[in-house]
C-alpha cells in the first residue's frame, strides 16, 4: 500500500499500548490519517455486506425510494443520488448511500435522538448482516479512541462515557455511472465533521489526502487496511 502515513498493526496495541498509541498520535498530528492492519473486522462479512448493497443499488430507483425517508435527514436508510451537499460546496455529490446506526432497546431514552434502522425484507439477512458489521466497526473505533486517550496522557477509558450509545453511523456509498455533462463531483475535496472515521477500500481507487507537507497524495492498494482519520 502506498500512503504518506504509517500502516500499523492493531496487534501491537495488545503488546505495547503506549508505543502503538504514540505512533497513532504522531500520524494524526502530522497527517490526520493512519492505516490500521490486523484490525479484526471480518473480511468475509465485509464482502457479504458489499454484495448485499450491490443488489440494493442495482434496484430500480422507484424501488430504492421506498427506503428513503426525507424526514430523517439521511440519518438512516437510503439517501438518493444528488441529495447530499458537502460542507462549503454549492453542488450536491454524484452519489447515493445507505446509513446503518446503533440498535437500541425499545425503552431506551436515547431513541428520541436515534431512529430505528431500516430493513429490506426482500434481501435475506439484510438487517442482521449490516447490524453485525456496524458493531464490529463500533468496537474498533472504541479501541482506537482508547489509544488516542493514552497518547493525550489520559486514562485509556477516558472517552468511554462520551461514546457510550453514541450516534455513530456506517455509511455504504455507491457512485453510479455518470454523463460527462453532469455538474458536480463524486465527492470533492472536503472535511468530515466526525471525531474518528474508519474507511475500507472499495473496488476502485479514489481516496486522496491533502496535506500541508506533501500537497495532494493518493492512497492506493489498501484492501486489507482500514484507513482511520480524525475530522
Predicted features, each with a name:
Residues 1-231:
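Peripheral, non-catalytic segments flanking oxidoreductase cores
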Amino acid at each position: 500500500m502506498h500512503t504518506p502515513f504509517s500502516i500499523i498493526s492493531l496487534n501491537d496495541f495488545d503488546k505495547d499500548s503506549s508505543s502503538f498509541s504514540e505512533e497513532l498520535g504522531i500520524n494524526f498530528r502530522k497527517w490526520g490519517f493512519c492505516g490500521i492492519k490486523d484490525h479484526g473486522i471480518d473480511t468475509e462479512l465485509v464482502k457479504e455486506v458489499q454484495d448485499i448493497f450491490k443488489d440494493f443499488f442495482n434496484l430500480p430507483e422507484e424501488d430504492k425510494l421506498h427506503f428513503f425517508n426525507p424526514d430523517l435527514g439521511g440519518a438512516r436508510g437510503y439517501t438518493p443520488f444528488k441529495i447530499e451537499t458537502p460542507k462549503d460546496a454549492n453542488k450536491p455529490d454524484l452519489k447515493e448511500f445507505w446509513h446503518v446506526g446503533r440498535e437500541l432497546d425499545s425503552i431506551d431514552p436515547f431513541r428520541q435522538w436515534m431512529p430505528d434502522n431500516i430493513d429490506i425484507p426482500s434481501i435475506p439477512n439484510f438487517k442482521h448482516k449490516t447490524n453485525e458489521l456496524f458493531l464490529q466497526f463500533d468496537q474498533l473505533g472504541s479501541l482506537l479512541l482508547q489509544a488516542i486517550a493514552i497518547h493525550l496522557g489520559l486514562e485509556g477509558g477516558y472517552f468511554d462515557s462520551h461514546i457510550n450509545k453514541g450516534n455513530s453511523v456506517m455509511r455504504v456509498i455507491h457512485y453510479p455511472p455518470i454523463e460527462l455533462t453532469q455538474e458536480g463531483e463524486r465527492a470533492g475535496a472536503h472535511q468530515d465533521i466526525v471525531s474518528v472515521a474508519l474507511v475500507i477500500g472499495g473496488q476502485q481507487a479514489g481516496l486522496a489526502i491533502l496535506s500541508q507537507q506533501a500537497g495532494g497524495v493518493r492512497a492506493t492498494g489498501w484492501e486489507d487496511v482500514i484507513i482511520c482519520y480524525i475530522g
